[in-house]
Amino acid sequence: MSSKQIQKAGDNSVNVQGDKVTIVTGLTYQEVRQVALDVFQQNFYQLAGVAADTARDRAEQITDKFLKELESRNPEGLAAATDPDFLYSLFTAQREHARAGDDELGDILVDLLVDRTKEQSRTLIRIVLNESLRVVSQLTSDQIAVLSLIFTLRYTKSYGIHNTKSFSKYLKTRIAPYIQGLPETYAALQHLDFTGCCSISIGSVPLENLVAGRYPGLFSKGIPQEELADMQIEEPIVNKLLLPCVRDRAKLQIKSINEDALRNQATELGVSDDTVKKLVKLDKSHRLKGDNLWKEIDAMEPQLADLRKKWQSLRLGHVSLTSVGIAIGHANVRRVTGESSPLSIWIN
């Protein structure tokens, strides 16, 4: 079987033969909208009656959402309408939203598309985003919740946490939103592995390490001053790294929220690395652990008790994300929280 295709080029246009796509340069938002809808109409399988109307309405809906978000986040991205690869990605998003009609999926597709307009050359991020647009429609909302939760816990660190109040806010706004949406069975995790969003390893990361271990300065029981004296630290300036323990004023604790911050402050003060190692070792032996730790965390955000159960039953500690899983998790985090850190922090 053969087919004959005839190209007709008008002013300011670039024709791409194969899968009916015509790209026109120098377009307005309204013209780009029409090009996008024409691409959908020409490439989506033909339906009849109500199904056709529904598919067209959904395609228009996601196209309008995309253009509105593009105008807000990346107005220069309008030039992507001249890129055949991007138009194919846009059609992928239209097609999947037309089939599913799911608002959550639509919002994630839009976020991925806007990020895609920022990649003019064939970068790794561009390849990852193209694949993410194809894969995300194969996932359920609870599987997407897994990606966002693992992304937040394993691949991000909040620099706005300085005390228990800000930590409590972090739990409520960055962790809790995904807990009730987690799947009930391990099969959901196996499907994430199958779609290339994650890998499941033999080794496991304890939830305690990810929730509290990133911010140990909040969970010190205090270092007895006699133990500090026994270390025979010969640098008096080390006292500037310590403060009275919030749980026991007769004891001391490291002033910094975590080890990275401690090392930065020690460098500024000229404290030796050997002394820092001694302080960290001593501090680790006087932190809240186990039930005592979770009692405090549960008081800040009760849903963490549910997360501990799911962490075990779903074996979430064994899950690490691929680049595609990170991109989808990142897009959903932005949808849920409004956070806007660039994807290039994790994929470059």
What is each stretch, according to the model?
Residues 82-137, 145:
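Long, low-complexity, charged/polar intrinsically disordered regions in eukaryotic proteins
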Residues 65-84, 91-93:
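Functionally critical alpha/beta secondary-structure elements and their flanking flexible loops
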Residues 209-342:
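Short, amphipathic alpha-helical interaction segments positioned at domain boundaries
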Residues 1-49:
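Long, low-complexity intrinsically disordered regions enriched in small/polar
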Residues 166-183:
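Short helix-coil junctions and helix-kink-helix linkers
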Residues 59, 63:
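Extended, charge-enriched "interface" segments that sit outside catalytic cores
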Residues 124-165, 175:
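Winged-helix-like regulatory helical subdomains adjacent to P-loop NTPase cores
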Residues 186-204:
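A short, conserved structural fragment
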